[in-house]
Amino acid sequence: MLPDRGKQIATEPIEVKQGRLFETEPTFSNRSTKAVTFQGKLTLPVHRWYRLTPSFSPELADDIAGHFKLTRDDFVLDPFSGVGTVPLCMKHRGISACSVEINPYLHFVGTVKTRDYTALDAIESTFKRFIAEYRSSLERVPYESAPGDYLREHAEDIPRINSPERWWSPGNMAQLVSLRRTVMGFVSEPHHMDLVRMAVLGILIPVSNAKHNHVSLTFAKKPLPTVDIAGTLEQQLARMLRDLRAVSNYPAPVINVYLGNSKHLTSVLPEQTKISAVITSPPYPNRFSYARETRPHLFFFDFIDGASAVGQLETDAIGGTWGKATSVLSEGVKPKNELVDGLLAPYLHGINVSGDLMASYIVKYFNDLYDHASEVAKVCKEQARLAYVIGNSKFYEHPLPSDELLASVFGHFGFKLERIDRMRKRQSKTGLYEAVVFMRR
């Protein structure tokens, strides 16, 4: 029972229900938004544990696996793991898979979501013990009457994110600091403890001043009032436990999520890894920053050392454009070879006239993509099938057909284009779409 029935519990405006397996034959043109984007995972068990807006639908990953006629003899790679959508879908199909993720927080998400959990009663007991301990700790926190005093006394426990007061109101931040301290002192089986951390990280944005009103998080004009964070967390833990029970009879193939850079796959994956299918969605060339989007999570449990490390993470990532990466772009970036130069030349002239920074961004993106494609070629079997979900871009009203350019880069490494299906129109600008690029070795 909650201590105060009148206090608000922060929740996402999402219908909570168990998902179903996908029953229709896959089609890839004129798909609904739910069948392409993150919206497709909001009601599916385990997939819904953390919302990342620029992630794609489990239904799409499942449809691609069906289109490829993958069996349990196949081995699937997602080199841009994100929140683990592809490896989790493959797990539920009984197909072994691996994925690679450069962001340490997102690597954690994918790892926790794709693990096997069998001791569900013990997990439930851990959840109950943790909530009880957290509620007990809150009795000593004046988060309604004097949150500022508590925060000053425990300043060393506030996440090291820049301007934390922008992210959380004082009463909510005081509760989160107490929650963070409780997690650090709680003793449990490590994998069960990771589930608790996952639940905590999953509520950071719902109890914050940030909103999912756009592709990137934005701050609300009016800060969120003090809410019942213990109640919000208890709901999240209960939802996660229901999800684990819902998938408890699903197959349990080998799934591995590796921390590393997809531009260096052969250094990240075990030796002799041979992939029969790649299903993935790389960052779109649209200046979206995954490092910026996940800052609260990166800092809350110290997945990253500090602001400079976030800047380096952004610089190393394909499509990095925020923070330190902007300084790199401002110095100018040249095509790394004749292939990239020739592919981009028809598009860069108009963009260069309007802004050198954006031209450098595009060049860096496709330089990075070239390095990535060269590594994919080294780990794929003969006859491997590839599906890359990507959106096109517009820079100063100049279109950039990212799907076609990607196919050309992979063609250089021996991957034949089968077809490009443009799945849906995007709503942010006229002329934008999302496509899936099918290729075969």
For each feature predicted by the language model, list its residue ranges.
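Conserved S-adenosyl-L-methionine
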Residues: 57, 64-138, 232-267, 271-320, ...
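Class I S-adenosyl-L-methionine-dependent methyltransferase module
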Residues: 96-99, 103-249, 291-355
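C-terminal target-recognition/interaction regions appended to catalytic cores
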Residues: 199, 203, 394-396, 426
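A short glycine-rich, Lys/Arg-flanked "PGG" loop and its adjoining helix->strand segment in the class I
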Residues: 367-382, 410
